[in-house]
């Protein structure tokens, strides 16, 4: 938004303060200023001069030598203009002037010196057309020696305000509103208030009819006669041009002028056009779907039912608050008009803008929410401006219409301690009263409590709560005057959040050490997906209207991870993903919600493939990854047990069991296995998937038990050794049985043992499987000898034989 300093000076003496002080106060206490620039400063180098003499150029038939006088000295100009004569007042660009990309210099034309250039309106960028030199004879205030900038009222500073910073302040979207704010901040008086304009309405002028309804907060119309349409006076033209508004004629320009001055849009209808439709009967109503009519911008959009219209005799003449109709607009022959001044619901205007795609200066102000009681004062001010702009025989009827939302007092109660505590300063009652009364609030005190009456131009959506008053006081005092001091607080060791700490460790280990990718999924899924793991009858149904595929809260992370896998299965040969999420059950607390850590690994083939050795190796590899994570957080006491879960392949699933709590009871911490082929098919998965799911709270509990026990052992400086041993065990027998027996032998050098491969078929007896174990040996005192390694190997072989295991 552009604001003219000269225009605002009509209301308060800003020019007495100085530009730097104004800009500083605006930046600190009001809003952001994008720029503050002089308007057309180059025109200071163009003066009004009088032609003293004319003579032919001795060497060029189409040129003339002109002697001009600027009030203090004479100059010689060579020109090709043919429309000038002695005594004419014309604009002269003196040497040093820059007009566009052209710089005026002293020069010689065919041997004759020329000290400047006589200019047309086009050369001064005042018009798109220029037929010869601009003749200023008879124009008001066209005086010899005056600069064109001063003559055109262009001697001004234009502020460009960042609109986003005043979206909440509709009272600042006008010159008077902004000047009023600056007067409050700079302790200046208001010398003229346009809202206090007076007008004697004429009872002889026929009244228009306005149909009352609830589609507007306020709507008034006045019938005006004695109108003459011609170009606006230079003051009106210059002020509109400086604010980036196109000049049209003296009537339409007043409508734009009063909007920029007071922030209240108005509209003028051609009265004769309205009367041709029948008796004038204006109404605010909604459009019919597909309805259209020609607008001022030459468009005729097909309207939706949510668009608000102004109708006369049921026929549309304007889109309310957005744009007027072309046929009802003021014409050059117009002698009578009907003036509209209204305030519409901001929500309605926003819908009209969205529906039509039309965003005008009027609609920008309406969508912010205007004060409904300003409509009548604006009519009186507009009538005065019409008269000032040339309509000297003006007569106007008493405005007719309605006001549905009269001014309601907004009172805010607070106390001095609240204000000082929020600002971090100590203000007295006098300080607070001074600031608020300068901002036009009315303050009354009862002890340390105060009651504040909000001015009517601020109570709409703006100042409504005590915190708003704190902001008003703080910005007016100046945030730069509030001393910055560090917050003083007792330094305490933060409470350790084990859940968050372990979650971070887990994410780091799986993402960095094991190369998994973390995924995030919604907690909503379908009732059918809840059937895969758990009792679907325990599903928690979402009360909101949701599509069937998002109708319940999930009871497992499996469906989400399988869908992630399906999305990526054609892009990657191997997928390793994990997720931390919550699952929900229709059970009493605390069983109604659990935090789960789960992962899915998709490899090359489905679990129906005959290469069982490869399947076993992959499974053992993932199992080893889980064990390495448990070891990284110092959890060593656990076992894997076979357990049948419907989501897993019958022959490939384990549960992780550990002792936890004071009673030391065994509890299931999680599950690991190949996802059942039927489930893979239902999710359209082409590859086999290993899925692991663990109750995170159980892992946290185990970690908390074990983290307090120091298990650090200095790494051995001697090479480690490994022993591999393959034995036959029952097809359905737990492979951990043998490793548990080995642990009971308490071999001092034995660090750990694990299954690294399994095999069935071939020459392995039916009902049996070949299991290969690997044992890691560490000696902290000496290098292993072959004899010692053989002793340990023989001890393991004897142990296997004693317990009925056959060597392979």
From Swiss-Prot:
Mg(2+) binds at residues 462, 468, 471-472. GO terms for molecular function: ATP binding; magnesium ion binding; phenylalanine-tRNA ligase activity; tRNA binding. Keywords: Aminoacyl-tRNA synthetase, ATP-binding, Cytoplasm, Ligase, Magnesium, Metal-binding, Nucleotide-binding, Protein biosynthesis, RNA-binding, tRNA-binding. One of its GO terms (cellular component) is phenylalanine-tRNA ligase complex. InterPro entries: aa-tRNA-synth_II/BPL/LPL, B3/B4_tRNA-bd, DNA-bd_dom_put_sf, Fdx_antiC-bd, Fdx_antiC-bd_sf, NA-bd_OB-fold, Phe-tRNA-ligase_IIc_bsu, Phe-tRNA-ligase_IIc_bsu_bact. Pfam families: B3_4, B5, FDX-ACB, tRNA_bind, tRNA_synthFbeta. The keyword Protein biosynthesis applies. It is an enzyme of class 6 (ligase). It catalyses: tRNA(Phe) + L-phenylalanine + ATP = L-phenylalanyl-tRNA(Phe) + AMP + diphosphate + H(+). The keyword Transferase does not apply. Residues 40-149 form the tRNA-binding domain. Its EC number is 6.1.1.20. Its cofactor is Mg(2+). NCBIfam families: pheT_bact. Tetramer of two alpha and two beta subunits. This is Phenylalanine--tRNA ligase beta subunit. The gene is pheT.
